[in-house]
Amino acid sequence: MVVNTIYIARHGYRSNWLPEGPYPDPLTGIDSDVPLAEHGVQQAKELAHYLLSLDNQPEAAFASPFYRCLETVQPIAKLLEIPVYLERGIGEWYRPDRKPVIPVPAGYEILSKFFPGVISQEWDSTLTPNEKGETEQEMYMRFKKFWPLFIERVEKEYPNVECILLVTHAASKIALGMSLLGYDNPRMSLNENGDKIRSGSCSLDKYEILKKSYDTIDETDDQTSFTYIPFSDRKWVLTMNGNTEFLSSGEEMNWNFDCVAEAGSDADIKKRQMTKKTSSPIPEADDQTEVETVYISVDIPSGNYKERTEIAKSAILQYSGLETDAPLFRIGNRLYEGSWERLVGTELAFPNAAHVHKKTAGLLSPTEENETTNAGQSKGSSTANDPNIQIQEEDVGLPDSTNTSRDHTGDKEEVQSEKIYRIKERIVLSNVRPM
């Protein structure tokens, strides 16, 4: 097997980003090795739950040895029950002229005391950044050199691992992705629209191999025929860019190489504050439109009853006429007409909770959950809201999203029960034939 899926995440919201302290000293005693703010800790838990909800979950995590990255990966490791390895090769980028010093992260002996039972000692860093600092070009060359060496080691030492997670910093997250995609420098655009890799706090990128490194199953001997593809010949595609949809406060502290200041530094914070002061406030809308979120079950027809109908991740869902007896749906390039029916049985919608697809010994748990489609915001549809059904989050659970302030001053975790909605309506779709 080969590594065919790579997640790359930036650490959570740092304590020195708070508008008004407290600003705790680094526990490691290393300059700028600041811990996360309470808000950043909650972001890390939200990221952990999001990864838990995915079918394709990381089987191992590699983290920059700076404290904020380990705080970010800790709830992920506990929730997904995966090992965490220290990797200096994906560490922070510091310019040679940085003052007063260029931070060097702590090692396993110190960090294991702060994160007992989380960090594995069974890994030596693939590369070590120049402790005298790096120019932008030197930093980018570090990551171009890092990838083939790192992936070769992972596949050799952990041959059954196909999906991994890297937890790093803003500049490193961008440079890792751009070098993996084969770009010449980290400042280039991803497309003609000028899009770039986004790097908000606790944002998540996903890279997948364009061509699987295996061919077909040999039915004669019931074995899979593998064709190994060297790393230099593998083609990667970015399938998730700076995703923050799972964060209750959305994207925060995005950074890119057009910024002059070091990512997350005091200079970076001051520049953001000045920009915020000089920018014009966005006027509030005069009218407030009331909306109602409606959860319904949508049945999609299949041409073959023996096969499961699947929708491509990139497919666009459009709908109209939910207030009518025959609403129209467009899924990808197909058009459907719907008819309302009463749902037989029980389906539940969990608006904010993660759907659990936990792996045990490399396999998904036998519990399968019904797929529910949020058909949009509309009036006139019947939806039952049962306030008696609630769930209890565990220690690494999510906070109630309504209690999160963007100022994040004096943030404290406040775990709330969450409502679950019972779905009673369904729409059965039928293909609309072209005229």
UniProtKB/Swiss-Prot annotation:
<dbReference type="InterPro" id="IPR019481">
    <property type="entry name" value="TFIIIC_triple_barrel"/>
</dbReference>
<feature type="compositionally biased region" description="Basic and acidic residues">
    <location>
        <begin position="405"/>
        <end position="417"/>
    </location>
</feature>
<dbReference type="InterPro" id="IPR014623">
    <property type="entry name" value="Tfc7/tau55"/>
</dbReference>
<dbReference type="GO" id="GO:0042791">
    <property type="term" value="P:5S class rRNA transcription by RNA polymerase III"/>
</dbReference>
<dbReference type="Pfam" id="PF00300">
    <property type="entry name" value="His_Phos_1"/>
</dbReference>
<feature type="modified residue" description="Phosphoserine">
    <location>
        <position position="365"/>
    </location>
</feature>
<dbReference type="GO" id="GO:0005634">
    <property type="term" value="C:nucleus"/>
</dbReference>
<keyword id="KW-0238">DNA-binding</keyword>
<keyword id="KW-0805">Transcription regulation</keyword>
<protein>
    <recommendedName>
        <fullName>Transcription factor tau 55 kDa subunit</fullName>
    </recommendedName>
</protein>
<dbReference type="InterPro" id="IPR013078">
    <property type="entry name" value="His_Pase_superF_clade-1"/>
</dbReference>
<dbReference type="GO" id="GO:0006384">
    <property type="term" value="P:transcription initiation at RNA polymerase III promoter"/>
</dbReference>
<keyword id="KW-0539">Nucleus</keyword>
<dbReference type="InterPro" id="IPR029033">
    <property type="entry name" value="His_PPase_superfam"/>
</dbReference>
<dbReference type="Pfam" id="PF10419">
    <property type="entry name" value="TFIIIC_sub6"/>
</dbReference>
<keyword id="KW-0597">Phosphoprotein</keyword>
<dbReference type="GO" id="GO:0000127">
    <property type="term" value="C:transcription factor TFIIIC complex"/>
</dbReference>
<keyword id="KW-0804">Transcription</keyword>
<feature type="region of interest" description="Disordered">
    <location>
        <begin position="362"/>
        <end position="417"/>
    </location>
</feature>
<dbReference type="GO" id="GO:0016791">
    <property type="term" value="F:phosphatase activity"/>
</dbReference>
<dbReference type="GO" id="GO:0003677">
    <property type="term" value="F:DNA binding"/>
</dbReference>
<comment type="subunit">
    <text>Component of the TFIIIC complex composed of TFC1, TFC3, TFC4, TFC6, TFC7 and TFC8. The subunits are organized in two globular domains, tauA and tauB, connected by a proteolysis-sensitive and flexible linker.</text>
</comment>
<feature type="compositionally biased region" description="Polar residues">
    <location>
        <begin position="372"/>
        <end position="391"/>
    </location>
</feature>
<dbReference type="InterPro" id="IPR051710">
    <property type="entry name" value="Phosphatase_SH3-domain"/>
</dbReference>
<dbReference type="GO" id="GO:0006383">
    <property type="term" value="P:transcription by RNA polymerase III"/>
</dbReference>
<comment type="function">
    <text>TFIIIC mediates tRNA and 5S RNA gene activation by binding to intragenic promoter elements. Upstream of the transcription start site, TFIIIC assembles the initiation complex TFIIIB-TFIIIC-tDNA, which is sufficient for RNA polymerase III recruitment and function. Part of the tauA domain of TFIIIC that binds boxA DNA promoter sites of tRNA and similar genes.</text>
</comment>
